[in-house]
Amino acid sequence: MNFAAISHKSTFTDCYALNTDEVIVNLHTGKDVTAVSIIHDDPFAHGCMGHRPWYGTPVAMKPEWELKHNMIWSVKLRPEFKREQYYFSITAGNETVLMFEDGFYTPGEAEKKGRMKQYFKFPWLNSADVITPPDWVNETVWYQIMPDRFCRGSDAPKRFPTRKWSDGKNIHFWDTYGGDLKGITEKLEYLRDLGITGIYMTPIFLSNSNHKYNTFSYETIDPDFGTEEELVALVDKAHSLGIRVMLDAVFNHCGTEFAPWQDAVKNGLESPYWDWFFINQWPLPKLGMKTEDGRYYSFAFGTMMPKLNTNNPEVIAYFQRICSRWVRDWHIDGIRFDVGNEVSHKFLKELGRSLKQVDPDVFLLGEIWHDSSSWLQGDEYDSVMNYPFMESLHNFWLDHQSSWELMYSMNRCLTLYPRQLNNVLFNFLDTHDTMRAVTRCGSVNTFFQQLAVLMTMPGSACIYYGTEIALPGGDDPDCRRPMPWDKIAEGKCDRALRDTKVLIEMRKAYPETRMGEIIWKHDDEKPRFVRYARYVEGSDRVVGVYLNAQETSEKLNLTGKVLFSRNLRGKTLMPGGVAIVLEEPEKWIG
C-alpha cells in the first residue's frame, strides 16, 4: 500500500459542512487502494469518560474523484446530534489498515490493550460555520464589460476619445474609445436577448486611464463614463430586465491623485493618512517610473498605483462606508475585488461582515489566479475567478492531451474547494487580462468546443464582451478592442451569436449542466474523443457532451434530443465538432 499517497485532515475540503444537516468527508489515496470505509458515530454515543469502548458504524466510501496520481474517496454523513467521530478502514489488494489521526495501524495493533486511539473529529455542525454563498449566483450567466470599449451612448458627449470606434487595430495602453454607462444601458436588451442575467463592469470611478484601475476617487463616477444618476438608471433598468450588476473594487491600491495619497506625499509623517500606505522614503524621489527602489510599495512596481494598507482600521472603516453605500444606495448586487489576494484577511472579514448586514445576498468575488482556499472559508469571498479552470481547459488542446488528462484537470479544479463553492466559482474562457479565447484556441471550432465545456461545468459562467461573437485579440491591450457593433448590425456575427445563445439557453434550461455529478467515459483507442455527462441524482435524464478533438470523424450513438451541435452531420461528429444531447441515465450509469 502506498501510504505516502494517503492523507486526511478534518478541516476544509477533507471534512466540512455541506449544509446545516450534512457533512462531507473526503480521503485522498493512491490508485492502489481498492476499498475504503469510514467508521463513524457520535463521539459520546457510548459515554464520555471512557468507561465503555467507543465503536462506530462502518459505511463504504465512494471513489468520487480520480486525479492523475490519486483517488479521492467521499461520503456524505448526516450526524443525528451534529457531531462526528471517525476513522478509516483502507484496503489495497489483500492488505487492510486502519487510519487514525496519528497514523496507520493494523486491526490487531489498533485493538491492543491500553491503546489510546486518536480519532478524527468533526466537533459540532454550527449553522454559522456553514459556507453558504448566495443561491442566485449558480443560475447567473455573467457578461464582463469594459465600459470604454463596449458602447458609446447615442447622445453621449464626445469627451476625450482618442480613437475611432471602428478602428480596433494596433491598440495602445492609453487609447480611449469613449464608451460609457449610457451605452451599456442602451445595450441591456441585447444582453437580455443573449441570455445574460448578470453584468460585471470593470472600474467606473474617477481616474485618468481608460481601464480606471488607478482610482482617484471611490465616490465619484468618472465623467468619461457618466454620472451617478446614469449609473442608478443603468442598475434600475438592468434589474427590470432580470440582470444583476457587479462593480469592480480596487482596494489593493489606488491612483496617485487619491486625496489621502496626495496628503501623505505632501505632509509625510505629519499626514493623518501616512499609515494608509507603505511609504519607505520621504520625500519621495522624483525620478523613475518603477518602485523597485523601495520608495513605496505599489501594484506590480508601478508608480501610478500605490498600495493601500488594508491592515489599517481607518482604511477598513473607509471602505466599509464606501461599499455599503454602493450596495444600499445604488442596489449593486456584487463586488469584484481586484488583486484580491494581496489585501489583508482582516480587511476582507470586516468588510464582508458589514456588507452582508446591508444585503445578505450580495456577491463578493475575489480576483485570485491560484488556489484560493485561504480566502474561501465562508467569512471573506463568496467565490473567486476560476483561472485554474481556464488554464486547465486550454491545456487539453495546447498539449494535445487525452480525455483522461482533461478529466484529471477538471477534477483537480473541482476538488480545490467544498462542493457548494464549486457551484458558484466564476468560470470563463477569457478576460481583460488574457488573450482572447478564439485567438488562443486558434480556430472557431476549438473555441466553441471550449465554450460548450464552459456551459456544461459546475459554476457561474461568464462571457467577456465580444466572446459571444468570437472576437479575436492578443494579449493586453489587444484583448480590449472595441465591440464591433457595425459587424453585428450587418449580420456578420449571426452564426456565432446564434450558437452562443443556444448554449446559454441550454445552461439556463437544464440545471444539471451547472450542478450535480460529472460522469466520464473514455476510449483508450480514441484518446482525443471526449465524452462526459452531467447528472443530478434521482433524475430521469442526463446531459451528454461529446467533443471530437481527433483528426478523424466519429460516429455517435445518438438516441436523444440534440440540445446543441456544431459540425454534426447526421450522427457523425466531424473533427472539431461538439454535440450536447439529452439522454437517458442508463446510457451512462452502471
Feature map (PLM): residue ranges:
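Active-site-proximal helices and loops of the catalytic beta/alpha 8
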Residues: 235-243, 253, 258-268, 324, ...
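Hydrophobic faces of well-ordered beta-strands that scaffold small-molecule active sites
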Residues: 141-143, 199-201, 245-247, 335, ...
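Non-catalytic, glycine-rich low-complexity segments
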Residues: 1-33, 110-128, 133
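Aromatic/acidic polysaccharide-binding cleft in carbohydrate-active enzymes
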Residues: 148, 160, 377-383, 423-445, ...
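C-terminal beta-strand-rich structural cap/linker in extracellular carbohydrate-active enzymes
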Residues: 569-590
